[in-house]
């Protein structure tokens, strides 16, 4: 059997795709794989802020078209890039183990933490979620909009004379560059910054009629990561969230219970609501929708 896997062409996307392939090969060594690189709109338009060129799905549409047409068998995405609406023919398969969900500050060597940064320090990020949470913690910071892949954004510290940039920890860890960086890494825990819903989780997308693939992908499922994905994406869907407003969520699991913390902000950051809701693990999705209702009431 041969499986053709669609992926974006960035170093991180290919690293993630190959990680999934390696996991499957451990269980099914006889399967052959081919990786097909597909360029997306989000990859091609690098000079405009993400919230200006459209919504979630910017890094996905062209890949989904090839899934539907049968040119590829499955696709590996960062789940946080995925819209909550999916083409009728497609579905997410089983969820593999989540990487670190936190955001990180990559800092100029002079500084070890966000608290050590000087007044009005320049921090690069293109995300409203990151921007407004940073400003909630330290309103003197000067947030500079940046875009690009992981390496490009790290290079902007030198090129644009920044004190630091914010990235997803998952990307740094998957690329395995934490040791090689000539910068300090400061992890932003969830009391400073809630991650994007499903940050650090990979989405394995297939056509609904591919039961043969479902069976194979079940072998790399991680139950807890799956529950987190369901709860956090229910919250995202409930607040009807795209790139235009700050949205964060994290689901913590303790034995048979979950606690979901969600954040929603106005587009200009003038108001940010953060709330938590707990319950039984089997109600994870319901809790996501209920928490969305609570924050929507408050923000309006």
Swiss-Prot record:
The modification S-(dipyrrolylmethanemethyl)cysteine is found at residue 243. The keyword Transferase applies. Its cofactor is dipyrromethane. Signal peptide: none annotated. It catalyses: 4 porphobilinogen + H2O = hydroxymethylbilane + 4 NH4(+). One of its GO terms (biological process) is protoporphyrinogen IX biosynthetic process. One of its GO terms (cellular component) is cytoplasm. InterPro entries: HemC (IPR000860), Porphobilin_deaminase_cofac_BS (IPR022419), Porphobilin_deaminase_N (IPR022417), Porphobilinogen_deaminase_C (IPR022418), Porphobilinogen_deaminase_C_sf (IPR036803). Binds 1 dipyrromethane group covalently. Its EC number is 2.5.1.61. GO terms for molecular function: hydroxymethylbilane synthase activity. Keywords: Porphyrin biosynthesis, Transferase. SUPFAM superfamilies: Periplasmic binding protein-like II, Porphobilinogen deaminase (hydroxymethylbilane synthase), C-terminal domain. It is an enzyme of class 2 (transferase). Pfam families: Porphobil_deam, Porphobil_deamC. Pathway: Porphyrin-containing compound metabolism; protoporphyrin-IX biosynthesis; coproporphyrinogen-III from 5-aminolevulinate: step 2/4. Belongs to the HMBS family. The porphobilinogen subunits are added to the dipyrromethane group. Tetrapolymerization of the monopyrrole PBG into the hydroxymethylbilane pre-uroporphyrinogen in several discrete steps. This is Porphobilinogen deaminase. The lineage of its organism: Bacteria, Bacillati, Bacillota, Clostridia, Eubacteriales.
